[in-house]
Amino acid sequence: MQLEKMLTEVNIERSKFNTYNVLLQYIKAVTQKYNLNKVSSKYGKVLFIKDGVVKVSGLSQIKIGEKVEFVGKNLYGMALNLEATSVGIVIFGEDTAIYEGVIVKRCEQNFAIKVDKTMLGRVVDVLGQPIDGLGELKDTKTTRVMSVERKAPGIVTRKSVHESMLTGVKIVDALLPIGRGQRELIIGDRQTGKSAIAVDAILNQQVNKDIVCIYVAVGQKKSTVRRLVEMLNTKGALEYTIVVVSTASDAAPLQFLAPYTGCTIGEYFRDEGKHALIVYDDLSKHAVAYRQMSLLLRRPPGREAYPGDVFYIHSRLLERAAKLNEKYGCGSLTAFPIVETQAGDVSAYIPTNIISITDGQIFLEKELFNKGIRPAVNVGLSVSRVGSAAQSAVMKKLAGALKLELAQYRELARFEQFSSNADAVTTQILKKGKLTIELLKQVNNNPMSIGLEALMIYAMGTSYFQNLDLSLVRSEETKLLNYINSIASFKLYAACVDAVKAFNPKDTVFAEMCQSYVK
C-alpha cells in the first residue's frame, strides 16, 4: 500500500515499475515539488570538525572562496574544498562553538571588508575591525565595501614605474632604488634586520605624508606588534599608517587572509589616486598557514609539503601592487614582502617563488650582521630591476660607480686575508671600500632625507673623508649632518635635491657644504 501511495503521488505508471527507477523519480519529484534544490544549495550541515576545518553536506552550488556563516554562532568561514558530496570549509575564529549538526548558510559573496580613510592611525584585525581599544570605525560618505580577493590591474590600466619611493636607508636608495608601484622583496635569515628596513621606509614617509602605509603582521607575537605600534606612535608615523594584525595565536585561516585584507586597504587608496606602501611581514608564515590549512583539507602535498597552488596565492597577491596611468587616477601601491630564509638558503621553495614574482630583492646576510655591518645588505645578491627608472638625477650620478667599487672591494678583501703584501692600487681600493661600508652603515629607526643621503655619498669621495681613520668615520658623519642642519641654506638645498633634473658633482652646493665644514 505504501508503494502504491508513492507511485500515485508522483504519477508513475505501474507498467514502468522498477524499484530503483521509482525511488529515483520519487526523489526528483519531491525535490521539485518542495523546491529542495534551492534549500540544499543555500544551507548545509556540519558533518565533522577537526583543527579549525569542517566538512559540510549540502551547499551544492557554493563557489571556491565563498563566505559562509555558521547560523547562530556569530562565526564565519570560507569554502576551500569542493568535493562530490561535501564542502571543506575553514573557520575564521575559534572552533569550540562548532559541532556536528550545526547549520551552515551561504553568504553568496566573497569575504569583504569596509574600508575608509578613518582607518588611518588604527590597528585592525583581518576582518577590518579595530582592536586598539579606540572605539568603533564609523561609516562616512567615502566608506566602501571591498572584497579581499580582487583582480589585479590589467596591462591597459598600468604605467611604468617612474616615481621614486624613498626609504631613508642610504644603501637602498643609492644602490637598490625603489619606485612607486614596485614589488621589492626583503629576504634574509631571522634577526638580520628585515623588518627594520621596512619600518624605516614607513618612517621616512613622514617628510611629506603623501604615501599611506599599511603594515601587515602575519603570525607575529602580540608583544612585537605592540612595540611596533608604540614606536610608530612615538615617531609620529601612526597617523598615516594602518596596522593589520593576525598574531601567532590566531587560527591559520586568519593568518592566511591577513595579507589580502591589507592589500585591499592599500587598493582603496590607490584607486582614489593616492600612493600607498604595504609591508607583508612575513610571507613565510603566510605560506606555512596555507600549508597547514591544505594538509587539514587532505590536499595532496608537494615540495616541502606545500600544496601545488602555493605559488598562485603569492602571485595573485603581489600582482595587485601597481602604478596606474592617468586615466585611472595615477595612484600606486608599492609592496615590500618579507621572507625569512633558513641558514641563508635562497634556493628554498618559498624564497625562489617570491623572487620570481617580485621586481627585485634586498638580501640581508647573517655574516654581515654579526660583523656589525647594518643594514646587513649583500649588494652582490641584491637587485632592483625597475627602480633605476625612478631614481633621482643626483643620486644616479653620485651612486653610479658605488656598486662597482663595492664589488671590487669584496673581491680583493678575500685575498687580503691570505696576503698582506698588496700594491698601492689594491691598498687604495681596499681602504676606499672600507670607508664606503662604514659610511653606508645606519642606525635603525633613523631614516635620512634624500638630500642628506646624497651629501654623505658625495662626502665619501672627498679627500677629507678619504684620509680619516675608520674609527672616526661615524662620528664625523654625525657632526657633518648636524652642521648641515644648522645652516638654513644648506638644509633647504638638501630638502629639494630630489627635484634637481641635472647634476654636476664638480659644480654643486655639496662641494661648498663639505668645504665649509672642513674649515
UniProtKB/Swiss-Prot annotation:
Primary site of residence: mitochondrion
Stored Pfam families: ATP-synt_ab, ATP-synt_ab_C, ATP-synt_ab_N
One Gene Ontology MF term: ADP binding
GO cellular component assignments: extracellular matrix; mitochondrial inner membrane; proton-transporting ATP synthase complex
One biological process term in Gene Ontology: proton motive force-driven ATP synthesis
CDD domains: ATP-synt_F1_alpha_C, ATP-synt_F1_alpha_N, F1-ATPase_alpha_CD
Residues where ATP binds: 188-195
Record-annotated site: Required for activity: 382
Origin: domain of life: Eukaryota
Compartments reported by the entry: Mitochondrion; Mitochondrion inner membrane
Keywords for the protein's UniProt record, in alphabetical order: ATP synthesis, ATP-binding, CF(1), Hydrogen ion transport, Ion transport, Membrane, Mitochondrion, Mitochondrion inner membrane, Nucleotide-binding, Transport
SUPFAM superfamilies tied to this protein: C-terminal domain of alpha and beta subunits of F1 ATP synthase, N-terminal domain of alpha and beta subunits of F1 ATP synthase, P-loop containing nucleoside triphosphate hydrolases
Record family assignment: Belongs to the ATPase alpha/beta chains family.
PANTHER family: ATP SYNTHASE SUBUNIT ALPHA, MITOCHONDRIAL
Quaternary organization: F-type ATPases have 2 components, CF(1) - the catalytic core - and CF(0) - the membrane proton channel. CF(1) has five subunits: alpha(3), beta(3), gamma(1), delta(1), epsilon(1). CF(0) has three main subunits: a, b and c.
Role: Mitochondrial membrane ATP synthase (F(1)F(0) ATP synthase or Complex V) produces ATP from ADP in the presence of a proton gradient across the membrane which is generated by electron transport complexes of the respiratory chain. F-type ATPases consist of two structural domains, F(1) - containing the extramembraneous catalytic core, and F(0) - containing the membrane proton channel, linked together by a central stalk and a peripheral stalk. During catalysis, ATP synthesis in the catalytic domain of F(1) is coupled via a rotary mechanism of the central stalk subunits to proton translocation.
Identification of the protein by name: ATP synthase subunit alpha, mitochondrial
